[in-house]
Amino acid sequence: MLNPSIDSLLTKIDSKYTLVTVAAKRAREMQIADNCVIEKPVSYKCVGKALEEIDLEVLKYVPSDDTIID
């Protein structure tokens, strides 16, 4: 995938793992409900649309304050 670039996406979400998780969850929502927020997305696949939403800051990730304490 060339657009949006990974560098651009990592300025929005700090971790590649988190980026993939957020995009996958949003893509699953779009498959079920078909509710893309972007009017004319470049990508036709749900994962690409989710990454575009993250890049345009329509979709944001807010980290939770839950921590694991041993």
Curated annotation (Swiss-Prot):
One annotated GO molecular function is: DNA binding
User: Known Pfam families for this protein?
Assistant: RNA_pol_Rpb6 (PF01192)
What's an example Gene Ontology biological process for this entry? DNA-templated transcription
Q: What class of enzyme is it?
A: transferase
Q: Name one GO cellular component term.
A: DNA-directed RNA polymerase complex
Q: Looking at the keywords, is NADP present?
A: no
Checking Gene3D superfamilies in the record gives:
3.90.940.10
Going by the UniProt record, its keywords in alphabetical order are: DNA-directed RNA polymerase, Nucleotidyltransferase, Transcription, Transferase
Q: Which reaction does it catalyse?
A: RNA(n) + a ribonucleoside 5'-triphosphate = RNA(n+1) + diphosphate
Where does the signal sequence lie? none
Instruction: Name the EC number(s).
Output: 2.7.7.6
Belongs to which family?
A: Belongs to the RNA polymerase subunit omega family.
NCBIfam families linked: rpoZ (TIGR00690)
Q: How does it assemble?
A: The RNAP catalytic core consists of 2 alpha, 1 beta, 1 beta' and 1 omega subunit. When a sigma factor is associated with the core the holoenzyme is formed, which can initiate transcription.
Summary of the function given for this chain in its UniProt record: Promotes RNA polymerase assembly. Latches the N- and C-terminal regions of the beta' subunit thereby facilitating its interaction with the beta and alpha subunits.
Name of the featured protein: DNA-directed RNA polymerase subunit omega
Q: Which gene encodes it?
A: rpoZ
